[in-house]
């Protein structure tokens, strides 16, 4: 019995011992053995603690020099600056470079104003509150210079009829059209199919019976 007990104790100790440091997997630390084992095991445990941290830090630090952390932040800031300039009026120099993206981005805001009062005035009030808070003066100066120009009016005119006028007008004729279209094909299809099918089935059945 003593040998079996010793064997079980050794197995338990072997499974409970911390694993050696491995580059792929962080070690499993058991704090209960901190007092009972010698400094060597403690050093192994500390190595287990440090190696995963170092490996994790190395994994984090490697991509930044390769991608360039500072230029990345600068690129993000540069990308955000034109977006802010589109909303704010002072920077007019970047607007001519981004006529195409700026016009579609701001025009949907303008057609929303005529669209919102049609369904309900309550939805119009929050848009008014949000617009003066963020770009109240931005939309006015943008619309003023766009009107004299030739490119914005062309793209601004199709946007207005597409959003408020066209979707509202076809909605009225659409409901009557589907029932008329569905009734017309149903009337000729129903009589044609049975007339063609019955005589064929009758002939085959008669031949088989005969």
UniProtKB/Swiss-Prot annotation:
Swiss-Prot/TrEMBL keywords: Biomineralization, Extracellular matrix, Phosphoprotein, Repeat, Secreted, Signal
Low complexity composition bias: residue spans: 109-119, 136-169
Post-translational modification, as annotated: Several forms are produced by C-terminal processing. Phosphorylated by FAM20C in vitro.
Membrane-traversing stretches: none
Record protein name field: Amelogenin, X isoform
Function statement: Plays a role in the biomineralization of teeth. Seems to regulate the formation of crystallites during the secretory stage of tooth enamel development. Thought to play a major role in the structural organization and mineralization of developing enamel.
Family that this chain belongs to: Belongs to the amelogenin family.
Native organism: Mus musculus
Pro residues bias (residue ranges): 170-179
Residues carrying Phosphoserine: 32
Main location: secreted
Pfam families associated with the record: Amelogenin (PF02948)
Organismal lineage: Eukaryota, Metazoa, Chordata, Craniata, Vertebrata
Region span, Disordered: 109-187
Subunit structure: Interacts with KRT5.
GO molecular function: calcium ion binding; growth factor activity; hydroxyapatite binding; identical protein binding; protein homodimerization activity; sodium ion binding; structural constituent of tooth enamel
Key word Iron present: no
Xref: InterPro entries: Amelogenin
């Amino acid at each position: 019995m003593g040998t079996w007990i010793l064997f079980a104790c050794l197995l338990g100790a072997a499974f409970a011992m911390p694993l050696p440091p491995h580059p792929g997997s962080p070690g499993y630390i058991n704090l209960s053995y901190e007092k009972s084992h010698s400094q060597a095991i403690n050093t192994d445990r500390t190595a287990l603690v440090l190696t995963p941290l170092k490996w994790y830090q190395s994994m984090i630090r490697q991509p930044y020099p390769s991608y360039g952390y500072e230029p990345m932040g600068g690129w993000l800031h540069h990308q955000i600056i034109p977006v802010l300039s589109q909303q704010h009026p002072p920077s007019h120099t970047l607007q001519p470079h981004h006529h195409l993206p700026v016009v579609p981005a701001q025009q949907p805001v303008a057609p929303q104003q005529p669209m919102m009062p049609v369904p309900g005035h309550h939805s119009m009030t929050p848009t008014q509150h949000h617009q003066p808070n963020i770009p109240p003066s931005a939309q006015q100066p943008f619309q003023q210079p766009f009107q004299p120009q030739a490119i914005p009016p062309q793209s601004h005119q199709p946007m207005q009829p597409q959003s408020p006028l066209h979707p509202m007008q076809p909605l009225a004729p659409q409901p009557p059209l589907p029932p008329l279209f569905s009734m017309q094909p149903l009337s000729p299809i129903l009589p044609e199919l049975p007339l063609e099918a019955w005589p064929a089935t009758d002939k085959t059945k008669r031949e088989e019976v005969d």
